[in-house]
Swiss-Prot record:
UniProt motif (RCR-1) ranges: 7-10
UniProt organism field: Faba bean necrotic yellows C9 alphasatellite
Motif RCR-2 location, chain numbering: 39-41
Residues noted as binding a divalent metal cation in the record, renumbered to the chain: 33, 39, 83
Annotated transmembrane regions: none
Lineage of producing organism: Viruses, Viruses incertae sedis, Alphasatellitidae, Nanoalphasatellitinae, Fabenesatellite
Motif (Nuclear localization signal): 48-69, 95-101
Protein's name according to its UniProt entry: Para-Rep C9
Job of this protein: Initiates and terminates the replication only of its own subviral DNA molecule. The closed circular ssDNA genome is first converted to a superhelical dsDNA. Rep binds a specific hairpin at the genome origin of replication. Introduces an endonucleolytic nick within the intergenic region of the genome, thereby initiating the rolling circle replication (RCR). Following cleavage, binds covalently to the 5'-phosphate of DNA as a tyrosyl ester. The cleavage gives rise to a free 3'-OH that serves as a primer for the cellular DNA polymerase.
Further comment: The genome of nanoviruses is composed of six to eight segments. In addition, some isolates contain subviral DNAs.
Gene that specifies this protein: C9
């Protein structure tokens, strides 16, 4: 018998067992209870189906296991009931509800045959999953390097309210100044979109997925002569139109930050000088 969702009881005497889970586990919640004796009552949701012995090894301590009969929400609530609680509850990971978007993605990428049957959906699901994992790591750990003074300056500017004119232009001609690392870090935030430059239609297509996002444009040195000033002005003016695959567009009231990371200075024949705030690396 194999399943994704399980309920478990772990009897013990003495110190409360410390449960530790790995990447095979999507979500778990448990607490110390006492009725006639001390035990851990819990729920575990795996990323893919597993047999009982495997789940026992994941939890440790030879727990009593049962395949979940109701919904994961009901089981999770029961595992956190107050009546018999001594300590806890404690949790691990993120609960995936049945029918949720994230659950569908996880189910799609679990079966390699989907790569052949639905290659476009499979690739998008893989990309979404990898991005979601990277976002969690960024949220937990913060920027993984010591901040340069210019990075601290930019972070200070981003804490201010954006306006409808200023584009923050980070200029570093030499390379190895932390621009791309910093840009990717910002791009992992949920209210930011990271773009490595490109054509207007390609970038507006990406932006339409989250049109209220702040935009980070990290321009590779080899593309410096093809800087897309049209896109910068469009998104700063909050007029976003994409004709890629299907026509879609919107005029938005919110103001956003636009950050350009480049090895060159802006061309003032192509963009108004009063729009640009230069930060030197």
């Amino acid at each position: 018998m194999s399943a994704v969702n399980w309920v478990f009881t772990l009897n013990f005497a003495g110190e409360v067992p410390v449960l530790s889970f790995d990447e095979r586990v999507q979500y778990a919640v448990w607490q110390h209870e006492r009725v006639n004796h001390d035990h851990i009552q819990g729920v575990i949701q795996l990323k893919k189906k597993a047999k009982m012995n495997t789940v026992k090894n994941i939890i440790g301590g030879n727990p009593h296991l049962e395949k979940m009969k109701g919904s994961i929400e009901e089981a999770s609530a029961y595992a956190q009931k107050e009546e018999s609680r001594v300590a806890g509850p404690w949790s691990y990971g993120e609960l995936l509800k049945k029918g949720s978007h994230k659950r569908k993605i996880m189910e799609l990428i679990k079966d390699p045959e989907n790569e052949l049957e639905e290659p476009q959906k499979y690739r998008r699901a893989m990309a979404w999953s990898a991005m979601d994992e990277s976002r969690k790591l960024a949220e937990e750990g913060g920027f993984p390097y010591t901040l340069y003074s210019w990075q601290e300056t930019v972070l200070g500017l981003l804490e201010e309210e954006p306006n409808d004119r200023i584009i923050i232009w980070v200029y570093g001609p030499n390379g190895n100044e932390g621009k791309s690392q910093f840009g990717k870090f910002l791009g992992l935030k949920k209210d930011y979109l990271y773009l490595p430059g490109g054509k207007t239609q390609d970038m507006t297509y990406m932006l339409m997925k989250n049109p209220k996002a702040n935009v980070v444009m990290d321009i590779p040195r080899c593309n410096s002569e093809y800087l897309n000033y049209q896109f910068m002005e469009l998104i700063k003016n909050r007029t976003i139109f994409s004709y890629k695959y299907e026509p879609v567009g919107c005029i938005i009231n919110n103001k956003i930050h636009v950050i350009v990371l480049a090895n060159v200075l802006p061309d003032y024949e192509k963009i108004s000088q009063d729009r640009i705030k230069i930060i030197y690396c």
